[in-house]
């Protein structure tokens, strides 16, 4: 969906992607831990080739984790410690995972050729990243994924079938249906403030509301981005590695929150907020 695409496309700001204005991801660690950490991160880097540049590698990892979250509602990995100098983080598909507090059971996919047995994994060996609770006040992310595509944005399925059959559909109010779909998705994604790509004022929104949504959505994205950085640093702590990832010169969630509050209070002009956003 467009909602998923927008999260994935905005999780890494353009300034960070291009190292613009000194925006970059940095790793603070001991020199003798650097190779181990880079190998751990590269084991997470499943959809990209092995990366030697640490800034690029960290950005790829953030994208990888977000991709799993927006597809499955969470990102789950198994910690495979071969030795103190060889640790791999293996991605798992969250489907058919059952949490029993002290351990997880992963049910195998159906296979007609051979018998597959459930896999028991200690929770000490699992690393799970979920959507921050602040972004799930009204609806869980999994609920959003289940419901956001249930209505066609153009017309109901039955009406579409009538159209294909050349039946008379002149009495159908397409505009009203479109408005109802907009309201439904707007409510479903209200914790995120997604603008549904409504960038200009129209019959459904005003310019003020559209700008508010743009700030709110970027604020939500920054919350998710900083949450992932926190979880990566927490992973290092679990592995007994003294290291910390941080983003330099990137707009923080607190800065977005402040701008959002000032905009709602009328303490910042349209020109100032547009300049801040772009």
Please provide the spans of the model-predicted regions.
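C-terminal helix-loop subdomains that flank or include functional centers
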Residues: 56, 194-278
């Amino acid at each position: 969906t467009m909602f998923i695409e927008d999260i994935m496309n905005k999780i890494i700001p353009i300034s960070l992607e291009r190292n613009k204005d000194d925006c970059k991801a940095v790793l603070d660690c001991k020199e003798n831990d650097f190779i181990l950490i880079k190998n751990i991160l590269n084991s997470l880097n499943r959809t990209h080739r092995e990366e030697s540049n640490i800034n690029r590698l960290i950005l790829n990892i953030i994208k990888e984790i977000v991709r799993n979250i927006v597809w499955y509602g969470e990102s789950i990995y198994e910690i495979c410690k071969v030795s103190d100098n060889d640790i791999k983080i293996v991605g798992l598909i969250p489907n058919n995972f059952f949490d029993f507090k002290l351990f997880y059971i992963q049910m195998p996919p159906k296979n007609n050729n051979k018998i597959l047995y459930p896999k028991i994994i200690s929770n000490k060996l699992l690393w799970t990243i979920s959507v921050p609770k602040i972004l799930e006040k009204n609806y869980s992310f999994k609920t959003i994924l289940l419901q956001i595509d249930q209505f066609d944005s153009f017309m109901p399925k039955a009406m579409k079938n009538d159209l294909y059959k050349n039946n008379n559909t002149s009495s159908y109010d397409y505009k009203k249906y479109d408005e109802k779909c907009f309201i439904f998705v707007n409510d479903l994604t209200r914790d995120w403030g997604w603008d549904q790509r409504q960038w200009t004022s129209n019959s459904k929104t005003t310019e003020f509301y559209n700008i508010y949504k743009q700030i709110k959505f970027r604020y939500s994205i920054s919350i998710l981005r900083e949450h992932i950085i926190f979880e990566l640093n927490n992973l290092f702590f679990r592995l007994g590695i003294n290291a910390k990832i941080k983003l330099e010169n990137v707009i923080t969630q607190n800065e977005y929150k402040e701008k959002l509050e000032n905009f709602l209070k009328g303490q910042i002009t349209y020109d100032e907020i547009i300049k801040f956003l772009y």
